[in-house]
């Protein structure tokens, strides 16, 4: 994790000139609109679980209150937007380790990348692990040695990333349940289903207090 913190800071500290990357204007509004649309597919489903729907609605309501009317990117940098453990090629040391897969890179805030990488909805997908608060703090402390960040913005991005993970899985669960011709292996379907199990939703709800 120390190497990952260093690599992320190195990417975020990389100078950039004129480019064709999208500049994220109001990322929270964009993320909310996307999540609301995905959630709508599950919530409108006649086979939707009432308790699951209740969690999703609560998460949406909380995030709605967190969307700023006006928002400006404080310290813009190149961000990956889809970071998970699979994006890191770790060598013997930090100097021969790399971050890969940059299909959806944009100009945004480092806090968005940090939150996506550390969110429970990200770590659980690849590793079945949900990081403890102490582990998140330790990672951020290491990152802060190389680049400063705004903790409040990080926390807000963290909540929105949790919403995105849950709503995407709820949408995918309905789609694959209704169409047995869609290609998906059993392991992936079970993982998607686990995101809308009450035990997982209760753990994630801790971020929406």
Segments the model singles out, each with a brief description of its role:
Residues 11, 64-112:
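Active-site acidic catalytic loop and adjacent metal/ATP-binding pocket
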Residues 1-55, 74-76, 106-107, 186-187:
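A cross-family kinase active-site recognition segment
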Residues 167-209:
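ATP/Mg2+ or Mg2+-diphosphate-binding catalytic cores
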Residues 111-148, 161-179:
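Active-site activation/catalytic loop segments of kinase-like enzymes and analogous catalytic loops
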Residues 57-61, 133-140, 189-201:
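Hydrophobic core segments within long, regular secondary-structure runs in both alpha-
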Residues 30, 58-65:
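Short proline/glycine- and basic residue-enriched helix-capping loop/turn segments at helix->loop/beta transitions
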Residues 23-26, 148-161:
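All-alpha amphipathic helical-bundle segments outside canonical DNA-binding/catalytic cores
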């Amino acid at each position: 994790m120390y190497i990952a913190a260093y690599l992320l800071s190195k990417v975020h500290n990389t100078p950039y000139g004129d480019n064709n990357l999208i500049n994220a204007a109001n990322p929270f509004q964009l993320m909310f609109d996307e999540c609301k649309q995905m959630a709508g597919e599950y919530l409108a489903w006649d086979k939707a679980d009432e308790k699951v729907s209740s969690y999703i609605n609560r998460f949406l309501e909380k995030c709605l209150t967190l969307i700023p009317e006006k928002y400006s990117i404080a310290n813009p940098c190149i961000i990956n937007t889809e970071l998970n453990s699979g994006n890191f090629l770790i060598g013997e040391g930090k100097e021969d380790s790399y971050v890969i897969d940059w299909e959806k890179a944009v100009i945004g805030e480092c806090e968005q990348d940090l939150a996506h990488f550390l969110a429970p909805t990200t770590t659980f997908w690849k590793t079945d692990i949900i990081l403890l608060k102490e582990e998140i703090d330790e990672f951020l402390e290491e990152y802060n040695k190389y680049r400063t960040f705004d903790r409040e913005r990080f926390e807000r991005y963290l909540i929105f990333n949790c919403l995105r993970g849950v709503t995407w899985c709820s949408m995918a669960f309905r789609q694959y349940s209704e169409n047995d011709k869609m290609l998906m292996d059993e392991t992936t379907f079970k993982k998607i289903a686990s995101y809308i199990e009450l035990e997982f939703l209760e753990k994630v709800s801790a971020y929406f207090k």
